[in-house]
Regions:
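Two-component/phosphorelay signaling modules centered on CheY-like receiver
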Residues: 2, 11-29
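Helix N-cap/capping motif at the beta->alpha junctions
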Residues: 29-38, 59-61
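Active-site beta3 strand of CheY-like receiver
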Residues: 43-50
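Receiver (REC) domain active-site loop signature in two-component systems and cognate sites
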Residues: 54, 62, 66, 92
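C-terminal output helix
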Residues: 101-114
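Metal-dependent catalytic cores of enzymes that make or break cyclic nucleotides
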Residues: 147-333
C-alpha cells in the first residue's frame, strides 16, 4: 500500500483528507513542517500533501528543507491551500511540486489528483530503471567490443597478450583510490584498453624484434602514439581517448614523447596510464628478458618519481603495490 504524508496545521483539514482517502493508502497525519521534516529523517513515503499557509514554518520553507533530506529529495509533493493567488501556484510548480490543490477539497477531484501523481511517479521510476538497464547493457557491450579489439591487436605478440586489459585494470584501481567519479573511471578504463592501438601500424619485424632497436626502428615504435591518436580522434563519446593514446609515453619532467609535455600539461588519464603501462612492462616476460622481481619493480617506480611519473599518482600506485593489490603475472599468462 502506498504511503502518504499529509501536513497541515488544521486538524479539521487533516481529518477531511483522512476521510477522503482512508482505506486506499497508508496515511500519516502531521501538524507542522517541523514534524514532517523530523518524520522524514527516518521514514520514507510515496507522496506528501503539504499545506502552503502554516505558522512558524510555511509550506514553501518546508518544501525547500524537505528536498535537502535523503528521504525527501525525490518524493512527489502536492501543495494544498485556500490561497486564490495564482502567483503562489506558479511559484510552487516552478519549485518542482507535482500538483497544486485548492481548498475546499472536492473528494473525487482530490482522489484523482493523488492517483495521477502516484501513477506518474511510478512511471517515472520505471523509465529510470529501464534507462539504467539499457545504459548498463550499452556500457558492457562497449567494454567487450573495446577489449576484443585490444586482444586482436595484441595477438600479434604473445609476450604482450593481455597487456592493455591489465593496464586498464591497474589504471582503474589507481583512479578509484584517487577518488575519481564513476563515469571518469569508466572512461579511463576504455581509454587504457586502447592506449596502444597505434601499434597496429608498426611492422611486425620492428614490433617483435628480439634484439636492441636501431635509432630508426625506435622512431618507428614511438610513432604508435601518433598513429593511435589519429585512429581514435573521431571518437567523441569518450573524452580524452585520443589523449590517452597520444600522451601515455610523456614523462613528468618533459623528456618523453611525442610532444615533450611536462607535469600538468600531460592529461591525467595519460599520467595514470603511463604508470600502469610501465608497471605491467616490468611485471611481464619479454622476448629479450624475464619479468622483473617485485623488489626491482618497486625500486624502478620510486626512481621514476617526479622524472618519469607523476608523484601524486605514483604514491597512490605504490600504496596499492605495497598492499599486494597489484597481481604478479604467472608465466602461463
Amino acid at each position: 500500500m502506498k504511503r502518504i504524508l499529509a501536513v497541515d496545521d488544521s486538524t479539521m483539514n487533516l481529518k477531511l483528507v483522512e476521510n477522503m482517502i482512508k482505506g486506499e493508502y497508508q496515511l500519516e497525519l502531521l501538524g507542522s513542517g517541523f514534524d514532517a521534516l523530523a518524520y522524514l529523517e527516518n521514514n520514507t513515503v510515496d507522496l506528501v500533501l503539504l499545506d502552503l499557509l502554516m505558522p512558524e514554518m510555511d509550506g514553501m520553507e518546508t518544501y525547500d528543507r524537505l528536498r535537502e533530506l535523503e528521504n525527501g529529495k525525490n518524493v512527489p509533493v502536492i501543495f494544498l491551500t485556500a490561497d486564490t493567488d495564482i502567483e503562489s501556484e506558479i511559484t510552487c510548480l516552478k519549485k518542482g511540486a507535482s500538483d497544486f490543490v485548492r481548498k475546499p477539497f472536492m473528494p473525487e477531484v482530490m482522489r484523482n489528483r493523488i492517483r495521477r501523481v502516484l501513477e506518474l511517479d511510478e512511471l517515472t521510476h520505471y523509465l529510470e530503471r529501464k534507462v539504467m538497464e539499457k545504459t548498463a547493457q550499452i556500457e558492457k557491450m562497449t567494454f567487450e567490443t573495446i577489449a576484443t579489439i585490444s586482444s586482436m591487436l595484441e595477438a600479434r605478440d604473445s609476450y604482450t597478450k593481455g597487456h592493455s586489459v591489465r593496464v586498464a585494470e591497474y589504471s582503474v584501481m589507481l583512479a578509484e583510490r584517487a577518488g575519481w567519479r564513476e563515469q571518469a573511471i569508466l572512461n579511463l578504463q576504455h581509454i587504457a584498453l586502447l592506449h596502444d592501438i597505434g601499434k597496429v601500424g608498426i611492422p611486425d619485424h620492428v614490433l617483435n624484434k628480439p634484439g636492441k632497436l636501431t635509432e630508426e626502428e625506435f622512431a618507428i615504435i614511438k610513432s604508435h602514439t601518433i598513429i593511435g591518436a589519429d585512429i581514435l580522434k573521431e571518437i567523441k563519446s569518450i573524452p580524452e581517448i585520443e589523449a590517452g593514446a597520444r600522451y601515455h609515453h610523456e614523462r613528468y619532467n618533459g623528456t618523453g614523447y611525442p610532444c615533450g609535455l611536462a607535469a600538468e600539461e600531460i592529461p591525467a588519464v595519460a599520467r595514470i596510464i603511463g604508470i600502469a603501462d610501465a608497471f605491467d612492462a616490468m611485471n611481464s616476460k619479454r622476448i629479450y628478458r624475464d619479468s622483473l622481481s617485485s623488489e626491482v619493480i618497486r625500486k624502478e617506480l620510486v626512481n621514476g618519481k617526479g622524472t618519469q611519473f607523476d608523484p601524486y599518482f605514483l604514491d597512490i600506485f605504490l600504496q596499492l603495490f605495497d598492499e599486494g593489490k597489484l597481481r604478479r603475472r604467472k608465466e602461463s599468462e
